A protein has these predicted regions:
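Bacterial N-terminal signal peptides that target proteins for export
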Residues: 1-11
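A structural "domain/chain start" motif
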Residues: 22-95, 175, 205-218
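Surface-exposed short loop/turn segments
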Residues: 24-33, 109-166, 181-186
Length: 218
């Protein structure tokens, strides 16, 4: 019995240690979409892959609005999948709004699900986007072989920064996140929420760097 208790404590301790070391993490995006002559193929340590239109100056925009993203993953097929997709899209939008407000880069950050776009705002940007990858993976597989990537959750976020006054796409980003470790594999929805929260946080960090004149960099 003592040996069993010791083994159980060791396994629990190892799982907790791994949970602390392995959360959601960023990997290379899968075939990000091009648009308006831009292709997100420049690596950035925070935003993933980006493409910035020539002459784009973030500091000239004082208002930014965030749309709800559409989940376009072909594996979303049944009602449970659709409910998950809807909840994660809402969560991502709220996290983007929160992180952008905390950054203090803009005078106003608008959640377009809650508030219409202000009429005629000067120098405004709108963030549109898609979630082309969204998968819960397998908690059982993560618990047993998560150290080797088995059963991992996955998500990919592709954003379009649109100049409101002209409709011109001025920047694209593509950010892919996966998670394969956690306490007894970790809850899939928790892993996905962590991925979206981290992506929103890191996008704000990228925009802060961009506003200081720094170029995207690995």
């Amino acid at each position: 019995m003592r040996r069993f208790d010791s083994t159980l404590r060791l396994l629990v301790g190892l799982s907790l240690a791994l949970a602390g070391c392995y959360g959601a993490y960023q990997i290379k995006p899968d075939e990000p979409r091009s648009m308006s002559g831009l292709t997100p193929n420049v690596e950035d340590k925070d935003a993933g892959m980006v493409a910035v239109a020539p002459g784009f100056d973030l500091k000239t925009y004082r208002v930014i609005a965030v749309n709800q993203f559409q989940v376009t993953d072909s594996n979303v097929k049944d009602d449970d999948d659709r409910r998950l997709a809807q909840s994660m899209s809402v969560f991502l939008q709220s996290e983007l709004v929160r992180r952008l407000r905390e950054s203090e880069l803009f005078e106003r950050v608008v959640n377009l699900t809650e508030t219409p776009m202000p009429a005629g705002p000067p120098n405004a940007l709108r963030i549109d986007g898609d979630i082309p990858r969204l998968g819960q993976g397998s908690q059982v597989a993560r618990a047993f072989v998560g150290l080797y990537g088995g059963g991992r959750t996955r998500t990919q976020i592709e954003m379009r920064f649109v100049e409101v006054s002209t409709g011109k796409v001025v920047m694209l980003t593509a950010d892919r996140r996966v998670a394969s470790m956690g306490f007894f594999g970790g809850d899939s929805k928790d892993h996905l929420r962590e991925s979206f929260d981290d992506a929103a946080r890191d996008l704000a960090k990228f925009l802060l760097r961009l506003s200081r004149g720094e170029a995207p960099r690995p």
